Amino acid sequence: MPETTRLPRGIVSFPTDRHADARIFCLPYAGGSASIFAGWRHALPASLEVCAIELPGRGSRFAEPALTHMDAVVDELVRMVGDCPPAPFALFGHSMGAVVAAELARRLVELGRPPIALVASACAAPHLPIRREHVLHLLPRDALIEALIHLDGLPPIARERRDFLDTFMPTIRADLQCRETWRSTPHDLRIPVHVLTGADDGLVSEADALAWHAFTSTEFSIRRFDGGHFFIHSAMQAVLDHLAAIVQRSLALRHGESVAPARHACAPDHDRGMK
């Protein structure tokens, strides 16, 4: 896959220095943009290309109204991924992005274009009921900000800068509406599903993470990292080392190569599944 491959609008590529074997389409948390993945290029093997999704209402698409319904978001993503030149790809999503990634995976499987793996980070399985205290999109501004801070639902820069919050509040609210009004049902994607959690993440319990097992009859693993809900920033290199191992293993499986079996059971401490 050449590094000069032209990708459609809405996908921000952080290309490698040589031809890549696979892409990782990355979906951010609520209110996040493609820029949160910019530092991943040099922390992943050159054989993997980071393709960050830029949805309307943020980053280079800030002037466009943010989407508030999951079907509209996934329709947009199916078009974007479909316009990419053929190549093996995995889907990675953090928090709300994991829910979007799961629905995108379902749609792509139905279309006969399955990803080689789904990696769901810092997110309860999407078919679980949303706790009442986590339904936020209708709250007034100040109450919404306080609730997000209390739930550790804001990245550090947003907690430190209220002007930043005011700028992106419509996008955050739209993303929350998209997630909180969406109801999923368990469906076997028939692809590997790997879950990442934060040891101090109060938003996602162990049971919430284990429930992702309902979305695959193939490989499943859970890995816990140091940090809270935004451990992908505080434990970035450890996360990316694990992500690279997942994608490389999934490529080998897709090519029919022999690999050691991954354990499905959760182990204590940090490692809970695939080695």
Region roles according to the model:
Residues 1-92, 96-266, 270-275:
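Domain-scale detector for complete catalytic domains at protein termini or as standalone homologs
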